[in-house]
A protein has these predicted regions:
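Core catalytic alpha/beta fold that binds nucleotide/phospho-ligands
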Residues: 1-198
């Protein structure tokens, strides 16, 4: 699926099996995973690289010292996300952030580290903690710096319409280091949500 944005586009896709990914990978993509010993990490990287290739066939990737991907010889910005069985890539003209998550993940275990009482009061939906986590992950990726505190440096201040997993789309307003940032949330299917900066 492709979601157009004012600054570019966000694509999301299921992660294919390892054999399909490796047989379809370019030599450069295979070199990029040569030192990765974890099979799941290799698959995740090959999956998002394949999705990026479908969005921008000539895109070349390099990695910053913190491991964040960057497009070589391009002014475009990239953000990537993956969960166990799904991958997302945001590609655009300005810094961006994207996060995809499975809804069966237990977000309540760590909610006290990222979900403030005022944020919790914004929505009563059972998946609201997942939405806030995704939004803050997307904001973190957009920020592109170390030492960001998910409570101090970013806040979700509004959601419209109220989160409704039947309707499947909503608009979020956040503050990142005091600056307003808009995000979109999307229910991909019964098991996944996607949030990206606008």
């Amino acid at each position: 699926m492709i979601y157009p944005t004012p600054w570019g586009q966000v694509a999301v896709a299921p992660i294919p099996d390892a054999e399909a990914l490796e047989s379809g990978a370019t030599d450069e993509e295979l070199r990029s995973v040569a030192g990765i010993t974890s099979p799941s990490r290799r698959i995740e990287r090959l999956a998002w690289r394949a999705l990026l290739r479908s969005m921008s066939p000539l895109a070349q990737v390099e990695y910053l010292p913190n491991g964040k991907p960057k497009l070589k010889n391009s002014d475009k910005h990239i953000s990537v996300s993956h969960c166990r069985d799904c991958v997302a890539v945001a590609l655009g003209e300005k810094p961006c952030g994207v996060d995809v998550e499975r809804l069966d993940r237990n977000f309540s275990r760590v909610a006290e580290r990222y979900l403030s009482p005022s944020e919790a009061a914004l929505a009563a939906d059972e998946h609201w903690a997942a939405v806030v986590w995704c939004a803050k992950e997307a904001l973190f990726k957009m920020a592109g710096r170390e030492g960001v505190d998910f409570m101090r440096d970013m806040q979700i201040v509004a959601v419209e319409p109220p989160v409704d997993f039947v309707q499947g789309r909503w608009h979020l307003v956040a503050r990142l280091f005091g600056e307003e940032v808009e995000l979109r949330g999307v229910v991909i299917d019964a098991e996944h949500i996607l949030v990206f900066t606008l």
